[in-house]
A protein has these predicted regions:
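Cytochrome P450 heme-thiolate monooxygenase catalytic core
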Residues: 2-13, 78-84, 102, 118-279
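N-terminal membrane-proximal hinge/A-helix region immediately C-terminal to the signal-anchor transmembrane segment
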Residues: 2-105, 120, 124-135, 154, ...
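Cytochrome P450 proximal C-terminal region
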Residues: 3-13, 130-134, 149, 180, ...
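Conserved cytochrome P450 K-helix E-x-x-R motif and the immediately C-terminal K′/meander segment
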Residues: 23-45, 218, 307-345
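Cytochrome P450 catalytic-core helices
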Residues: 276-295, 299-301, 407-422
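Conserved cytochrome P450 K-helix/beta-meander segment immediately N-terminal to the heme-binding cysteine loop
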Residues: 357-384
Length: 458
């Protein structure tokens, strides 16, 4: 893969506006596609200070300043109330939304389940899900499929198989649509986000999303209660994530998680977990279709039934996946709220200030990444990784609240990519308009129509 080739091809991204947007233009940009709202200076400055009708905010782009918020003084920067307001009705108070002692108890109890040894035990189940998708593609060779939808279906099937041993009764399409509907509706900026309206006033988005929320929360609750009853009765049960979570104990106290916490975390894993990995796979497959040199390298490494050792040898595939996560981070924004006054470097922060860390902006920052908008997987070669500042690359967050499922997601993505590349090559459909689109996660705005071709035929 030559530098000349890479520098003549800029993967699609919105062009930042020049200068600050006025209040109405900013609201429209945030509502239409949030990544279009950041002006060009955001990709060059260490921080941006701003205000809206709900108060002040600071966008951080300097790795040292980000470290201060996520590590050094993390206790002063919990997740902001607006984020919790949107997520809690769906995922309850699991790891994604819990705070303080509740979060610490959950984290130390759940984290051991996602250590490499635990994740490795799921690889065979993951491979079955990928094989079933590829068998369907065998019957559709030459056809055009929406790869974004295919990856969402795949990662949902993997979560269903590894978490619930495929015992979910609600049809996959119904569950998947419910999850997408909920997070899509609440990920859209509305007047409640920019005006000081009473918090008790019902949000139309919440009302629209409630039926979808009920579908997946009720289904998970049924499965959890059924499994808990079987365990209590001494029956043999699958060794999946439901069973492991019910049996997990706090390493400090020996106490189990409460039923409500187990339920909320299961909803979190199936709701938030599968969509982020689906987006990572979608964007990586798109980049492979655009950069055939990269596609050839992934195919050269590909293996049909990868185990943990085989995945560890996928050096080029991992580099390409990590570069895809840089260009198209599945979660484009994260935010915190200052509990009390603080200094972040030279920036004085008042209590209540919203701190925004935007991987979409950070990963394309001109001072941190040479050729920031270009696809250059060699950035992540073993000999180059040490040059990347630790807090310049945050596809899974960082600090105490780094994504607990990071290892699971990376192994899942590597396994899917190598199995797909061994058997198929994907080509973007003629005339397809590909543009990233941000709600809570980053997806292609119009899906990703691609033609499925058997690898041996090309």
């Amino acid at each position: 893969m030559t530098t000349d080739t890479l520098q003549t091809r800029r993967p699609p991204a919105p062009v930042p506006p020049q200068g600050a947007l006025g209040p109405i233009a900013l609201y429209r940009a945030l509502r239409a596609n949030a990544i279009t709202a950041w002006r060009a200076e955001a990709y060059e400055d260490a921080y941006i200070i701003g205000r809206n009708r709900l108060g002040g905010f600071v966008l951080l782009n300097d790795p040292d300043l980000i470290r201060h918020v996520l590590i050094d003084n993390a206790a002063n920067y919990p997740k902001d109330n607006l984020q919790l307001e949107k997520l809690t009705p769906a995922v309850g108070r699991g790891l994604l939304t819990a705070e303080e002692e509740s979060w610490r108890l959950q984290r130390r109890t759940v984290a051991p389940l996602f250590q490499p040894a635990g994740v490795t035990s799921y690889l065979a189940a993951m491979a079955i899900s990928v094989d079933e998708m590829l068998a369907r593609w065998d019957r559709e060779t030459g056809a055009t499929v929406d790869v974004a939808r295919e990856m969402t279906r795949l990662t949902y099937d993997i979560i269903s198989r590894t978490v619930f041993s495929n015992e979910i009764e609600t049809p996959p399409d119904v569950m998947g649509e419910a999850i997408t509907t909920y997070f899509g509706a609440l990920g859209r900026i509305d007047l409640w986000d920019v005006l000081p309206l009473p918090r008790w006033l019902p949000r139309p988005a919440f009302i629209r999303a409630k039926p979808a929320q009920k579908i997946f929360r009720d289904e998970v609750l049924r499965l959890f209660e059924r499994r808990r009853a079987r365990i209590a009765a001494g029956e043999s049960v699958p060794d999946d994530l439901v069973t492991r979570l019910i049996n997990a104990r706090d390493p400090e106290t020996g106490a189990p998680l409460s039923d409500a916490v187990v339920h909320d975390n299961l909803v979190t894993f199936i709701g938030a977990g599968h969509e982020t990995t689906a987006n990572a796979l979608t964007w990586t497959l798109f980049l492979l279709s655009e950069f055939r040199e990269a596609d050839a390298r992934v195919a050269a490494e590909a293996t049909d039934a990868p185990d943990a050792d085989a995945l560890a040898r996928l050096t080029d595939t991992r580099m390409i996946l990590e570069e895809a996560l840089r260009l198209y981070p599945p979660v484009p924004f994260m935010s915190r709220e200052a509990r009390s006054r603080d200094m972040i470097g030279e920036v004085a922060v008042a209590a209540g200030t919203r701190i925004i860390i935007a991987p979409w902006v950070l990963h394309r920052h001109r001072k941190l990444w040479p050729d920031a908008d270009m696809f250059v997987p060699e950035r992540f070669a073993p000999e180059n990784r040490g040059r990347i500042p630790r807090f310049a690359y945050l596809p899974f967050g960082a600090g105490p609240r780094i994504c607990v499922g990071m290892t699971f997601a990376m192994q899942e993505a590597l396994l899917a990519l190598t199995m797909i590349a061994r058997r198929f090559r994907l080509t973007l459909a003629e005339g397809a308009d590909v543009m990233p689109f941000a709600r809570m996660t980053l997806r292609p705005m119009h899906g990703l129509p691609m033609r499925v071709e058997a690898r041996s035929s090309g």
